């Protein structure tokens, strides 16, 4: 995101000029652009993987705009290439089809282009235009269509991106296809899942951004890289001892936007810290990893809506819900109504959830299914296939 009113004014003025130029440049209906800005991950990684595994490169040119094209040279082949952000300008103006999951350059697609923003999750917390008082006047609607996972989220996404309702299409997130993959990702991390009784995933949302310009909680809750409840190395040492005694593993996946300067812990025998950079280095698809975990612990992160598709136990740490609500805010009036799992406000509650899972106690199956029906229109895989068909891309 371009920071500062003056810079934004220049940025969007330049975008208006480029949008005018874009109208007169011919489009290649055999070119698919996946715009990533940084790494190839999340929805874009899954969509790219689908295009490759189904050999769409035999009919289409597939271009990925990433931060460091040199990191993806092993994926290059005939009709498949990677460009940097500077090189993406030409691709945006010539591609017939564009997909992205965050921001793209401020260039409006033409009537001869299909540009789809599949964002990077189903929001519980306010995003984009909903945060105009914090983020300032900004534009997010540089697309033909924007996806939402269910009818409930159609007006929410339209408000968040300040676009028309008919631009919002109901489509499952491409990354959710990985929840139904048969591929094992644990071996890439040198983990043998069968060695453990239970494997838990803990995915806290971010409290303070990389650049420290966004802080969504109070000072008391941004210690230890925003990991809630356990704010000291000593408390994690105790937690690790508990996991070891239960012969179980805890995977803590940190949010990609989280500032990690205050991270006070590192890998332990039964606790592993995962970052986007590390998973990318190991070529691990996060959702293929998640599908084989036994339960999810999170807070306000969009991942829990997706995890509902697996019908496994979930828990929600809400120790800073009041502060988070006042700093960031939520897209629904009472977020607790949409949290189908144990509500945790203390370390004791955290341990109790682990114990319940280990002993097979699950009191929230009916509630999970109720919320899943509201937030996920599509319950299985096939999201990449449906999205490409909607865009008009076929083999």
Describe each PLM feature range.
Residues 61-73, 207, 235-279:
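Catalytic donor nucleotide-activated moiety binding site of glycosyltransferases and closely related
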Residues 380-395:
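C-terminal alpha-helical cap of glycosyltransferases
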């Amino acid at each position: 995101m371009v920071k500062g009113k003056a810079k934004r004014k220049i940025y969007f003025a330049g975008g208006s000029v480029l949008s005018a130029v874009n109208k007169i440049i011919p489009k290649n209906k055999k070119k698919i652009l996946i715009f990533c800005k940084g790494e190839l991950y999340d929805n874009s990684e899954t969509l790219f993987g689908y295009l490759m595994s189904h050999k769409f490169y035999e009919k289409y040119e597939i271009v990925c705009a990433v931060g460091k094209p040199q990191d993806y040279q092993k994926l290059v082949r005939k009709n498949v290439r990677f460009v940097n952000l500077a090189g993406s300008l030409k691709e945006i103006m010539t591609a017939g089809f564009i997909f992205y999951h965050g921001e793209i350059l401020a260039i409006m697609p033409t009537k001869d282009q299909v540009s789809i923003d599949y964002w990077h999750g189903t929001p519980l917390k306010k995003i984009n235009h909903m945060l105009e008082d914090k983020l300032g006047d900004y534009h997010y609607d540089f697309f033909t269509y924007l996806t939402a996972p269910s009818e409930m989220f159609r007006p929410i996404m339209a408000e968040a991106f300040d676009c028309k309702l008919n631009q919002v299409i109901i489509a499952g997130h491409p990354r959710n296809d990985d929840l139904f993959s048969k591929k094992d990702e644990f071996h890439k991390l040198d983990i043998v899942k069968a060695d453990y009784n239970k494997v838990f995933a803990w995915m806290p949302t971010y409290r303070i951004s990389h650049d420290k310009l966004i802080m969504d909680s109070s000072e008391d809750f941004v210690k230890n890289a925003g990991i809630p409840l356990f704010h000291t190395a000593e408390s994690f040492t105790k937690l690790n001892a508990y996991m070891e005694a239960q012969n179980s593993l805890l995977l803590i996946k940190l949010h990609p936007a989280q500032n990690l300067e205050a991270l006070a812990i590192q890998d332990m025998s039964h606790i592993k810290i995962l970052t986007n950079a590390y998973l990318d280095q190991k070529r691990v698809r996060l959702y293929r990893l998640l599908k084989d975990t036994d339960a999810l612990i999170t807070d306000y992160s969009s991942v829990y809506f997706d995890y509902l598709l697996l019908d496994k136990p979930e828990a929600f740490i809400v120790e800073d819900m009041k502060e988070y609500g006042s700093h960031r805010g939520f897209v629904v009036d009472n977020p607790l109504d949409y949290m189908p799992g144990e509500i945790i406000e203390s370390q004791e509650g955290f341990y109790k959830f682990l114990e319940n899972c280990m002993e097979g106690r699950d009191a929230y199956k009916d509630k999970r299914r109720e919320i899943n029906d509201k937030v996920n229109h599509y319950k299985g895989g096939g999201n990449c296939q449906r999205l490409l068909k909607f865009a008009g891309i076929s083999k």
